[in-house]
Every structure is written in structure tokens, then in C-alpha cells.
């Protein structure tokens, strides 16, 4: 027990230090007032992001390159937290961090599907790696090898032995039939959140209570956004809506998702689950602008 307490003390100190490095609203305003990208990056060099940007040469000062360097700071922060986390909670923290690898996997597969439209003078991997999260030694996917296959089916074969093998192998059949990555990406999302929820529920005592509340609240909003977007934009059937969402959460129940899938009024259901959201109907009138606001309400 003592080691667990000291472990939390160490990670708490580390996270508090990270909070102190966050940019203040005033700093964000000053940055947003920068006249051009070069001035913005120059200003960022005087913030905690500076050491990640200081190595950029003038001809490398592009928004994409700067964003990639800034991602390295987030990667270093996550890596530090993972390594300092108490043993019993480390699997949960690692799975949280794997969210970025999931994004990388989707980006790799999408790039393979669209590479034919790119400038042939630039190697595909050089284009793709600029948008990937720098997952470092934690990565389990052979991103470069996948991109260089130039074929989705061949890239999927390279995922054997990774945490994604069973999920992606099953969904790959539909990708081949429908010529779309949509069912595969949905399957990967669901698998990620199932595993994260399972890790939260493996914990005991106060750890479990807090993890279930935090992870469950994230899962609730994801589930709601999925079912609303699938219904509004993808026009999925009731059965598909249920299959493409999760039957558990913190406040959003399986019957809530099923009710939306069956045609119940979405706004009234949101208002019941989240009483503080009083303008759900107005937000849903224009989903394109309203859903992002609802997601962060």
C-alpha cells in the first residue's frame, strides 16, 4: 500500500508541474494576435514549447512541422506519466495513451486508400509521417511498412501479433466488400473503448470509483455523439446504430442509445441525462455547428 501511495504522490507532483506549464488565456490571446506563422512560432519559442521548436530552421517553419514538434511535448508528457503511474493503474494509463496510436492507425489506412491522388514526386511515407503522433517506443504498429505496401489488405496483414489483429481481421471482410474503411474504423473505436472500460473496471476501491466515473463520462459523450452522427449523417438503420455503439457507460444507458436508434426525441433525452445542457434542441437544429458545441458542453 505504501508503494502505491508514494507512486500517486510522484505522479501527482508531475501532473501539477505540467499544469503550471499550460499556456494562460492571456498567452493564447497574444499568440492568436500574431501577424503571421513565423511570428507565432517565434513567440511559442518563449513558452514551454520552446525546446521542441528551437531546432527548426527558417525553411522548416511551416504550420504542419510546428504542430508535429508540439506533439512531441505531449508524447513526452504521456510517457512520463505512464512510467511513473502505480503498477495497478499503469495498464489503464497505457490504454488511454493508445488513443493516439489508434489515430495513427486510421491515418495510415486512409493514406493507403488515397495515395493514388498524391504527388508521385513525394514518397508516400514522407507525406504520412508528418501527420502521425510521435508514439515512440510505445507503438505496436509498423506504420512505415504498412504505408509502403500501398495496399490496404497487405497493410492489414502486417498487424498480426498486434493488439489490433483480431478486431481488424474481422472488420476487413466488410472493407473488402464495401470498399470503405468506415466499418473498420468503427470496429477499432469500439474495441478501444471496450478495452479502456475493462481496464477501469479491473481496478479496486477508490481507483475503480474514480476511473469508472472519468472514463465512463468520456464514453457517455462518445456514445451519444456516435449514435447522433450515425443517425443524422450516415442514415444507418436501427440495428446498425445499436451495433455501432456500446451497451454500457456511466450515465448513458443501453436503453438510451436504443431509444435514439428507434427514433425517440434526441434533445429531450440529452436534457434528461445532462440537465445543465438547456439548449439541446437549438444545437441539434444545425448539426454541423451544433454537435461540436454539444460535445464540449
Model-derived segments and spans:
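N-terminal domain-start signal
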Residues: 1-297
